[in-house]
């Protein structure tokens, strides 16, 4: 595990302990009962693939450890609507506060503002967090293989499935991919960012994609800024992308989302 992931795990474990002391599992289950049913995160992406379209998981992210503040005028409901209007299939919403200035209420508000399924983007270590995710309205959780053992990943996956949520399993190298493929989740994310150095290269996705059988749905993550980047990854068999920073920095988020998905030339030809 990288140094940054170790630091994150330390504060996450403290956060979880504090949350458990404040909100019981029974409380979370009561909150879940008040949420609308999961919207089918994987199914929304699979439908795009089957139709021959790019699938976009559009990220609502205020800040990051590597870039600092990304969007000062941060309005999760407005961003959710803008992404939906631009053609995004799903949302990803940061709920981690120390590193990303995220919050649970951002997830709840963004999902309520549109009809798209939403991922709780956070660092998951305990099943309590899975119940938090569903209580806050999430349709999917993220599992980062670099920070979990195989047993932990399976336990979190199975808990998520039991609540009707999907699971995006994230990897960065070949050993992590081999471990991810032992899980039953069909959603595999390849993070092009090295969490030790923060360097980003699309070659990571291109290299690892060949390891994955056709019954899985691959998601390219990080370093995707243009339609040309999407086309490049498509050549490697990746038709689904998680994009945050490059869209969050644009004034017209809807137009930027559409341009990423179909290209400026296609828009100009309309």
UniProtKB/Swiss-Prot annotation:
It holds the Pfam family IGPS. It comes from the Bacteria. CDD domains: IGPS. It catalyses: 1-(2-carboxyphenylamino)-1-deoxy-D-ribulose 5-phosphate + H(+) = (1S,2R)-1-C-(indol-3-yl)glycerol 3-phosphate + CO2 + H2O. Keywords: Amino-acid biosynthesis, Aromatic amino acid biosynthesis, Decarboxylase, Lyase, Tryptophan biosynthesis. Its EC number is 4.1.1.48. GO terms for molecular function: indole-3-glycerol-phosphate synthase activity; phosphoribosylanthranilate isomerase activity. It is an enzyme of class 4 (lyase). Transmembrane segments: none annotated. One of its GO terms (biological process) is L-tryptophan biosynthetic process. Pathway: Amino-acid biosynthesis; L-tryptophan biosynthesis; L-tryptophan from chorismate: step 4/5. Belongs to the TrpC family. This is Indole-3-glycerol phosphate synthase.
